[in-house]
Regions:
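Binding/recognition "hotspot" determinant
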Residues: 1-740
Length: 740
């Protein structure tokens, strides 16, 4: 048994509070040459050690529970300060952590037997020679999780509450602690009359490992973590740039939350053989199984080897509302200086038609900026003259600008991503997977066999891909209003109002192929055999199935996005002088694309006997021209698989003023295509007893053309058409600038 020691200290000083609490597991330690624990009821071992130099025996008519104890630390702290004129600050923090203290059962020979259930949680069993765990009920062994949690919040307020800042961080993380069973040369045996469930375990033996039960389940250990960040500010901010100086006052808010899910694979490792037997089903998910010799897996009503997914989720929100003022230099002057600095890039007209049009638009824009800048610096209309003689020049009034503004913005983004925690099955010699009444399903798994692999099922054998899903979305909006002033004349000049926003979303699925690599012969026997998102390779093939389907899998995704914007400005002194701009864009795309074709390949030939063969964009055959793959079938279906990756975004804008409108256009286009040809390499066919060539059946026989990109186009246009140059006002502007 165990006890819990508690140590708690508190210091409370009103505005300063500190608390520390520590809880410690105090376990028992039992040491002897031979140890025998027996009970007519239950046996519970918590955070304790049972160590025998010879035999360790634990026997009970009731349940046997061998579980971890727990240490924990809790720290709480609060501080606050108050100053004059409404100024104050405060800080609050919490830290909490737990640590599991494993129970350990150690002996040269270890025997744990219950007439009910055996539960081993976060604890370890070590049998230096031989270990046995038996139960008439269930055997459950699982890892546990250490926890770390923290919370921290700071708040500051300035003069009369005009400025303030609050920052909150919260973090939580679980750490996987596997439960281990170690065995010596005579191996390890788990024998349950009901269910054997292993989750987050490491079972290792220099001898053989035997796992038996009605149902045998092997699972990963799932851990979660999250972090939250929240920040609220109220106050002043400023910036300096070549265009001027600005200062603003307002409120900014940021919130972000991230959730992470991790899968830690279980491990079954033997220096000899691994035997897994279930009278009902074997289910293994995200597991690593390795045997130096043979791996034998048998589930009378089915065998399932699959994966679990890690995931990442994040949601971020931002908002801001500010009142500001700025003083600066006319933007046309700043732009002209930048254009002169980048004149080499600006006049580069290489590339495709879209590139040339983009640069042409930039050049015309630079000329227009130059004209504005010239007029701003030197006004040629002085004294009514139309030329730029020295006596007629006047320093312009539009060099410096000033404005006051109100702006509000909001944005939100979210993302979800998954990654597969694959399973792996490895044997140095042979591997046998059988189901006498059911099916064999293998997904997202890497199988490697040194010698022969035998798959046998009464119903179906399916070797397929695993899925990784992702989604994303985002939106933003901005609203603004500003008043600009003429610094020289001391009056309000222009009123401007604007609004803009964006929206986007996307989702998709990526397929991660299973792989099977066999050093010797791959033999299968089933009603149906399906290879979907799988790459299977063996020295020789011996395939027997009524229906054989081999198909490649397409990654799929779609996306949609849009934007809008508009602005209106008017000269308050001369209301007939105004401008309005409206712009927007809309895009969408979809993708169906095979990353890697499904394949069934023999290095040195073999045979396939089937009633019906279906090949959809996959590759079958032999690497050896002299040792071909021989396929016997009554029916063959051959289909190529066509991929596409298409996206198009069309947008533009129009600016309306007192003269001819100015038009801009935006066009992005991606158009790609790929073909995955159903291919048969070095393969002889016999269809309904008649020899037939692969070409006659419609197969591609050139491995270099099995997967081929047939279209690859990408164009991007973002240009102003400068249609306003057709108007007299812009022509006069250029004429005036040209006369200086």
């Amino acid at each position: 048994g165990n006890l819990e020691a508690v140590d708690k200290k508190v210091r409370d000083g009103g505005k300063d509070y500190i608390s520390d609490e520590k809880r410690t597991n105090v376990g028992s330690n039992l040491n002897a040459k031979d140890i025998s624990l027996t009970s007519l009821g239950d046996i519970g071992i918590t955070g304790s050690n049972i160590v025998a130099t010879n035999k360790a025996s634990i026997q009970a008519k009731g349940d046997i529970s061998i579980v971890a104890g727990k240490d924990s630390v809790l720290h709480e702290e609060k501080h606050s300060k108050s100053k004059g004129f409404g100024r104050s600050s405060s800080e609050e923090s919490v830290a909490y952590a737990t640590r599991n203290v494993a129970s350990n059962v150690i002996g040269d020979k270890v025997n744990i037997t219950s007439e009910k259930d055996v539960n081993i949680f976060g604890s370890n069993v070590q049998a230096n020679t031989e270990g046995q765990i038996r139960a008439d009920g269930n055997i459950t062994q699982a890892g546990v999780k250490d926890i770390n949690y923290s919370y921290h919040k700071t708040t500051k307020k300035g003069f009369m509450g005009l400025t303030s800042k609050s920052v909150t961080d919260e973090n939580y993380a679980e750490k996987a602690i596997l439960s281990a069973t170690l065995g010596g040369d005579k191996g390890l045996t788990y024998d349950s009359k009901n269910n054997l469930i292993l989750s987050g375990v490491k079972v290792v033996s220099s001898g053989s490992i035997n796992l038996k039960g009605k149902n045998v389940e092997i699972n990963p250990l799932e851990t979660n973590s999250y972090n939250k960040h929240k920040e609220v500010k109220r106050g002043f901010s400023g910036s300096f740039s070549p265009k001027g100086i600005s200062v603003s006052y307002g409120k900014d808010k940021l919130e972000s939350k991230t959730d992470i899910l991790n899968q830690t694979a279980s491990q079954i490792i033997s220096n000899k053989d691994i035997n897994i037997e279930a009278t009902d089903k074997v289910k293994a998910k995200s597991v690593d199984i390795y045997a130096k010799n043979d791996v034998n897996i048998s589930g009378d009503n089915g065998v399932e080897i699959s994966t679990a997914n890690n995931s990442y989720d994040n949601t971020t929100k931002q908002s801001s509302s500010r009142i500001g003022a700025s003083v600066g230099i006319n933007s046309a002057i700043v732009n002209t200086v930048e254009n002169v600095k980048n004149i080499k890039e600006l006049t580069d007209f290489s590339g495709n038609s879209y590139d040339i049009l983009n640069n042409a638009s930039k050049v015309v824009g630079a000329i227009k900026d130059g004209a504005k800048a010239t007029i701003a610096v030197a006004d040629t209309n002085y004294k009514g003259a139309t030329d730029a003689g020295y006596d007629n020049l006047k320093i312009g009034k539009n060099i410096f600008t000033a404005s006051v503004s109100y702006n509000k913005s909001e944005s939100k983004s979210s993302v979800h991503n998954e990654t597969v925690e694959k399973s792996s099955l490895v044997s140095g010699n042979n591997m046998n997977i059988k189901s006498k009444n059911g099916s064999i399903n293998i997904s997202g798994t890497d199988v490697k066999v040194g010698n022969d692999l035998d798959l046998s099922a009464k119903k179906d054998i399916v070797i397929k891909e695993s899925e990784e899903n992702y989604t994303s979305s985002g939106s933003s909006s901005q609203t603004g209003i500003s008043l600009s002033a003429n610094l020289e004349e001391g009056r309000i000049a222009d009123l401007s109002v604007s609004q803009a926003g964006t929206r986007a979303r996307g989702n998709g699925t990526n397929y991660i192929n299973s792989t099977v690599n066999v050093g010797g012969k791959l033999k299968t026997n089933s009603e149906n055999l399906t290879l979907s998102g799988a790459n299977v390779e063996a020295d020789k093939l011996d395939i027997n199935a009524k229906n054989l389907v081999i198909e490649s899998k397409q990654d799929k995704s779609e996306r949609k996005d849009s934007s809008y914007g508009g602005s209106f400005s008017i000269d308050l002194v001369n209301p007939s002088s105004f401008s309005a701009n409206i712009n927007g864009s809309k895009g969408s795309g979809e993708k169906e694309w095979v990353n890697k074709q499904t394949s069934l390949i023999a290095r040195n030939g073999g045979k396939v006997d089937t009633d019906s063969l279906t090949n959809i964009g996959a590759v079958i055959g032999s690497e050896n021209e002299k040792e071909k793959l021989k396929v016997s079938a009554n029916k063959v279906i051959v289909k190529d698989l066509e991929d596409k990756n298409k996206y198009e975004n069309i947008g533009g804008g129009i600016t309306i003023g007192t003269d001819v409108p100015n038009v801009s256009i935006k066009h992005d286009k991606i158009d790609k295509e790929q073909i995955n040809r159903a291919s048969a390499i070095n393969t002889d066919f016999e269809i309904s007893g008649k020899k037939t060539s692969a070409e006659e059946l419609g197969f591609n026989t050139d491995i270099d053309k099995a997967q081929e990109i047939t279209k690859d186009e990408e164009k991007h246009l973002d240009a102003e058409l400068h249609t306003d140059l057709l108007g007299k006002d812009k022509q006069e502007e250029l004429k005036k600038a040209g006369g200086i």
